[in-house]
Design a protein with these regions (language model features):
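Nucleotide-sugar donor-binding/catalytic module of glycosyltransferases
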Residues: 1-160
Length: 160
């Protein structure tokens, strides 16, 4: 029940990103069961050639991939704010260069947003890996009042 909602995904990358830890997270975005109609990949300063080549290879296959290039490193906050302003869609999925998304992440989240129009921000629980092995599971509260109560002490979102 995705209702043909269009959405954007943003993926910031900086020079410190390792190719081997980047490839699987990047492909987990590309191979989603519900693909974004716009994937903004933001190069925050110069990036490694092998990462650039991989992205350009996929860009040749998928017309929804757009590259935004900042010549010098501006920092994650700046890059995310710029990316949000450049997105063409109401819904925006934030992705990290080291986070692997389950194949139907976008489908689940877009369906949830379609059914719950009062929702402004949506996150999820996460499983943390260390050396490709289970490290911990981070569960967040789903109760609105608990989220509000946590705001002064911690970020109630795993991915923000």
């Amino acid at each position: 029940m995705t209702n043909n909602y269009k959405f954007s995904a943003i993926l910031p990358i900086y020079r410190g990103v390792n190719f081997h830890t980047f490839k699987k997270p990047f492909e987990s975005i590309i191979n989603q069961t519900l693909k974004p109609n716009e994937l903004l990949i933001i190069f925050d300063g110069p990036i490694k050639n092998n990462i650039r080549k991989l992205i350009e290879e996929y860009q040749g296959k998928y017309n929804f991939i757009k590259i935004i290039n900042f010549p010098s490193n501006r920092g994650l906050g700046y890059v995310l704010n710029r990316a949000v302003k450049l997105c063409k869609n109401k819904y925006i999925a934030r992705c990290d260069a080291d986070d692997i998304s389950i194949p139907d992440r976008f489908k689940i989240q877009i369906n949830y947003l379609n059914k719950n129009h009062k929702i402004d921000v949506l996150g999820s629980n996460i499983i943390e890996l260390y050396d490709n092995k289970f490290f911990s599971k981070k569960k967040m509260t789903l109760i609105h009042e608990n989220i509000i109560n946590q705001l002064n002490f911690r970020n109630p979102m795993n991915h923000s």
